[in-house]
């Protein structure tokens, strides 16, 4: 087990009480709803206009992020339940149920008489049934596409019966149109679609498209931030930091790059925990209901040894986003590593897996808890599930070999050999590979004797 011991070295502290949740009245009064935003169907459009479907999804996502009533389900989770060529209603119903959405925002874009027609639809999921309704279509010349689709977030919010103040409506409308350049927005939408495909090729394509987007509009704040996210996924942390800082300089009221800087500080080789806390706090100041920033703040406080503060931050995150698997993973870690609370930890990890069956982090954490408790068969099952999702997950392969040493030495040899074959090609695994070879030699010697 490679990670649990490291967590324990943070030190055990007794939690005397959970932090009181001090929430902004406007946010506390709103019940969050899990929504899935999907690209609109553009199968009838020519190739040059296919990007418009992703463009609508991005405009909706940016706009609805400004209100606590909408908890957006990460689109990356859609890949685990299936991604069709076009998002027709049957596919939307299946996927929305698979990711536990309460509502799905989708639709179709067609072209008629030289004009673009956007037909938005809304699916509200209820136990046993789903009800889909069509919203008022938008018809426009292509040149007005960016301005008109920016109307959709408010249209959906009102259809979902979300009460909006004038200030909230203005924020949503402004965020829904992140650039005045249609060409920059097209490149941005294409870049986001490439990033969502994942993999090295998809991310490199996304970086190229997003770089062109901010060349077209140097003041495209969301473009700078998104390019930073892609660089971070490509392990280019310095390039990522440069883009995040550029975004904060262009618009100091945009919270996402501050949260992203917090993530970079937290993962830095040096212990930049204070800087991480400061960055997360800034993001929360700008958007008090920013659940992921509360999770990051909890992680930073846990790293500093402030266990009570960490749990308080996680609890706040759950208020704003009760369906975020990452929060439950963080609670699972801290409950066991810092408090020794086995049942609470297992419950938290299982809740994360219930919300996202492909959550590698949750299954790794649960496997490590089982392993530490001597529940080796259960641990093996979790590590194998991780490898099913990611066949090159060296941490799961290493842990699996260790556990098999307890129950089946011959199988442990097989697992060590598989781990060494893969990990020996990775510079970051060098020290672990050396340890693995020692285990392998010892096992072979014991079995031979």
Enumerate the language-model features and the residues they cover:
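Catalytic-center loop of serine/cysteine hydrolases
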Residues: 32, 58-59, 63, 70, ...
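Alpha-helical segment of the N-proximal tetratricopeptide repeat
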Residues: 182-216, 263-266, 299
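Helix-start (N-cap) detector for alpha-helical repeat units in TPR-like alpha-solenoids
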Residues: 184, 221-222, 255-256, 291-292, ...
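Position-specific recognition of the canonical hydrophobic site in helix A of tetratricopeptide repeat
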Residues: 195, 232, 259, 266-268, ...
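Structural signature of tandem alpha-helical TPR/SEL1-like repeats
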Residues: 201-208, 233-246, 267-282, 303-316, ...
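Terminal, low-structured helical/coil segments at or just beyond the last alpha-helical repeat
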Residues: 406, 413-449
């Amino acid at each position: 087990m490679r990670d649990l011991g490291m967590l324990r070295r943070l030190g055990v502290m007794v939690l005397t009480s959970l932090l009181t949740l001090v929430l902004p009245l406007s946010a506390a009064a709103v019940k969050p709803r899990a929504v899935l935003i999907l690209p609109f169907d553009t199968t009838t459009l020519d190739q040059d206009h296919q990007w418009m479907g992703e463009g609508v999804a991005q405009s909706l996502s940016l706009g609805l992020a400004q209100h606590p009533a909408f908890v957006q389900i990460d689109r990356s989770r859609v890949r685990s339940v299936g991604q069709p060529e076009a998002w027709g209603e049957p596919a939307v119903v299946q996927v929305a149920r698979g990711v536990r959405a309460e509502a799905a925002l989708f639709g179709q874009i067609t072209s008629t008489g030289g004009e673009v027609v956007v037909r938005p639809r809304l699916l509200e999921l209820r136990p046993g049934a789903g009800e889909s309704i069509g919203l008022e279509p938008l018809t426009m010349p292509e040149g007005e596409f960016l301005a008109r689709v920016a109307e959709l977030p408010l249209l959906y919010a009102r259809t979902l019966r979300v009460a909006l103040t004038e200030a909230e409506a203005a924020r949503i409308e402004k965020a829904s149109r992140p650039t005045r350049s249609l060409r920059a927005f097209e490149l941005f939408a294409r870049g986001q679609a490439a990033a969502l495909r994942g993999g090295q090729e998809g991310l490199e394509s996304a970086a190229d498209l997003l770089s062109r987007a901010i060349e077209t509009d140097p003041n495209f704040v969301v473009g700078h931030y998104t390019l930073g996210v892609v660089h971070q996924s490509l392990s280019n942390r310095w390039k990522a930091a440069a883009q995040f800082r550029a975004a904060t300089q262009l618009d100091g009221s945009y919270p996402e790059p501050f949260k992203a800087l917090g993530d970079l500080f937290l993962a830095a080789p040096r212990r930049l925990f204070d800087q991480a806390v400061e960055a997360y706090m800034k993001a929360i100041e700008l958007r008090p209901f920013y659940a992921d920033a509360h999770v990051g703040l909890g992680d930073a406080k846990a790293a500093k040894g402030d266990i009570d503060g960490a749990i308080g931050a996680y609890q706040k995150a759950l208020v704003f986003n009760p369906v975020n698997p990452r929060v439950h993973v963080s609670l699972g870690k801290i409950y066991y590593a810092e408090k020794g609370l086995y049942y609470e930890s297992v419950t938290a990890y299982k809740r994360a897996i219930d919300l996202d069956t492909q959550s590698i982090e949750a299954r790794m954490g649960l496997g490590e808890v089982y392993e530490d408790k001597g529940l080796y068969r259960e641990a093996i099952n979790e590590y194998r599930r991780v490898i099913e999702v990611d066949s090159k997950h060296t941490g799961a392969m290493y842990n699996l070999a260790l556990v098999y040493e307890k129950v089946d030495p011959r199988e442990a040899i097989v697992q060590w050999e598989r781990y060494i074959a893969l990990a020996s090609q990775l510079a970051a695994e060098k020290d672990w590979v050396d340890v693995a070879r020692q285990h392998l030699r010892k096992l072979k010697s014991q079995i031979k004797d």
